[in-house]
Amino acid sequence: PEHPVVFYKAETCIVGANDNIMLPPESTHTDWEIELGVIIGKTARYVDKKDALKHVAGYCVVNDVSEREYQMKRSASQWSKGKGCDTFGPIGPWLVTTDEIKDPQNLDMWLDVNGEKRQRGNTRTMIFGVADLVADVSKYMTLLPGDIITTGTPPGVGMGMKPEPKYLKAGDVVTLGIAGLGEQRQSVVAFKGKK
């Protein structure tokens, strides 16, 4: 794309690095996406790319869990329904400060489901780098300390698997990590509670 795709995830999607992913009651196409999380440390509005990284406090691992049915078929090209479900935003385990990460554009990342390799990549292949993203998003909204921008995912998501897509189901275990930022482990569980 010419410009970054921007969507919101609800606060209720945020969980810890090792918390469960709870499938929505009508889930049929819940997918995984390892992403680099960029945590804003200083208010940013109309920031130039050359100054963008001065507004970053640090980085973390994010699993941008996505229900593709909600995202693609029930949203009229607005992705938030499919990406903002409860528990669909595991972050952490740590916020690693920028002084510890010399180059956010050269971090290996990986994700496995039930011990099987699904995603392998490096942040150097991102379509838009961290500075590009901070500068671009700051044109449209004020970024506040604590805001998190996630940066896109490498190949290997379930909907892209051949010969046919694979999606998460109750009982699956997702493990993922980024070099220098730690690892996550989530168990996938069926919906619990009231509809």
Task: Locate each region found by the language model.
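Short, structured patches in soluble enzyme cores that scaffold and shape functional sites
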Residues: 9-11, 32-42, 60-65, 95, ...
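A generic local secondary-structure boundary/capping motif
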Residues: 21-30, 44-51, 79-83, 97-101, ...
